[in-house]
Amino acid sequence: MWGDSMRELGDAMDNELNAVKPVVEEGGMDGARKFIKGKSFQKSSTEHMLISPGRDGSVPLNGLKSSPADPHLSDVNSILDNHRGGGETALTSVNNIIMATSTNGDSDGVDGDAKRPSISNCSSRSSFFDTVLSTFSLKSNSQDTVTNEVKNIEVQFASEEANKKFRQMFKPLAPNTRLITDYFCYFHREFPYQGRIYLSNTHLCFNSTVLNWMAKLQIPLNEIKYLDKVTTNSSAISVETVTNRYTFSGFIARDEVFQLITRVWSKENLTNINDVLEVDERVSKKKGISSTPSSIFNNVSTNAYNDFISTTTTEPTSRASYMSENDMLIEEAIRSVDDYMGTPRASPSSSSSSSSSSSSLGSSTTYYCRPVYRLKPNAPFQYEGPFHVQETMDFPYKPEANNEYVLLERQFSVPPGLLFIMMFNEDNPVFELSFLKTQDSSNISHIGTFEKVNKDGQHYREFQYTKQLHFPVGPKSTNCEVAEILLHCDWERYINVLSITRTPNVPSGTSFSTRTRYMFRWDDQGQGCILKISFWVDWNASSWIKPMVESNCKNGQISATKDLVKLVEEFVEKYVELSKEKADTLKPLPSVTSFGSPRKVAAPELTMVQPESKPEAEAEISEIGSDRWRFNWVNIIILVLLVLNLLYLMKLNKKMDKLTNLMTHKDEVVAHATLLDIPAKVQWSRPRRGDVL
């Protein structure tokens, strides 16, 4: 019975809608009002359709007529004043359907009117024709309501100093962005990152510095779609945008934080909606476009009628299946107005405006910073190579396997290419000149560029200098001829430089040459440099002083390498600084691979090394030095205890010798001892009077 009634009602509404459409298009507002007041359904058929049967099949007749005492019909009384006695209009029929579908039809003694929801308190249950009329006029009071709600939301901004620090921390922000407050929390990705969340009037930002890595997160408020309290964590808040979902936890007072974020977020969204309505109105006036009645029927939404039933009744949505396709026009007209006036279902105009507004303020971006070592502005060098790489590799050449003596293998806080430019600079070889002067060298010729090419296609350069010799016999100085060959130069992988030094003025000087190899590569983090130095003596003829020459060369190379390390540290400290570079992509942690194969760089998801942090190699060296220092102190203490123990044993030994001597000569001591005759008892008498003492 209920299904038949709904189908009949749908047919009646379809006829009513088809009849009102041409009248509205021709007569405008006045024609629509006259038609609504003059047109009515047949009362008998309407009553038949609107009566909801009870459990026993009886049909209650109360509650169907409009009267001032019935609050559920108060919204339509003003429209139906002239037609109460003549029959119920289509407007009354629509409203009565809403009430009938919201009533369960139970006859348990509870009045059916008490169960009906109030139409006046629910904007989504407003009557169809009232909605159509409101669409013609584009009610301005709805915009005023939005504006008033925005004005009523009061927030207190942070101080100017805090706002200045906030803008320095998050620079790509709109000029009108102001900080409201910030909270300590954890940002969850693969693992929680400790930091602070910053709430402004336009953005929700997060900054973290954990494990020497840094991340910054900026979420425009107008891109946030949902805010929720995480049920599994009593201190967590979930923020969801169109593309991502972010979880923050560790709030001391989550409810207060959630309430403030929600208020600011609501204010931003309401302001955007109000701006959209004002812009649309100005554009319409500027172009001379008026909201004609025909536009209501041509620009309706495409929402299904079952959504309308689900929002106006507590009954299951399956009742919508009994409605005809033409009934959707009623829902479309209602939804078109609700969507346009800023209900939770966003209209296309508001979506496009929101997207354009978000593009002007920047999208939700997460960017990372990594530590890099750069040249200071006062550095006399120029370097245009990479400061960080994603993949590193070991040296493809092994000096140990080629009978070369390794002098050094150490890490420096500088990119390999930058260290190479510093040590073998072509335009300003200040480092090499300083190093040669520390080795008692003079008369240094011009150190040019690697423009010469040998038969193997390798670039090299040559220069000469005079070196003082400190040998007890032989010449006091010698001329040194140096050829520096660039064997391999790839700033993203490794660099190999071979320095050949000949000393023709020394004994057997034409029979040998000293060859020093300098190899540069990236460290495992892809930020610093591993410098490896080795040497060997290359003989082209035999010599009877070969062992002595090799020994002197080795000692001289070891001493020169120590001076070289000190000079490198001075130059790095003077001309290199720790800086930050924006990381576009991040790679996973490196894996230990075989010799010569590429490996991933240690680049965690959030990156920023603090300036005061030490490189790993320096930390290890300092730790080893402290261990050696503790070891030396332990040895000293043990040595002192051993000396004291030895002294005590010597003293004890002397005492034992004395006791032994006494035991050996005890008879002689007794024989030479003087005997004393001590009487056992001495009698004393009291002197009498007259005795002379």
UniProtKB/Swiss-Prot annotation:
Family matches, as Gene3D superfamilies: Pleckstrin-homology domain (PH domain)/Phosphotyrosine-binding domain (PTB) (2.30.29.30)
Entry keyword set: Endoplasmic reticulum, Membrane, Phosphoprotein, Transmembrane, Transmembrane helix
Top-level taxon of origin: Eukaryota
Record GO terms (molecular function): sterol binding; sterol transfer activity
Main localisation: endoplasmic reticulum
Pfam families: GRAM (PF02893), VASt (PF16016)
CDD domains recorded: PH-GRAM_GRAMDC
Residue intervals of the VASt domain: 403-576
Modified residues (Phosphoserine): 591, 594, 597
Lumenal side: 652-693
Domain notes: The VASt domain bind sterols.
Protein's recorded name: Membrane-anchored lipid-binding protein LAM6
Species this chain originates from: Saccharomyces cerevisiae (strain ATCC 204508 / S288c) (Baker's yeast)
Gene name for this UniProt entry: LAM6
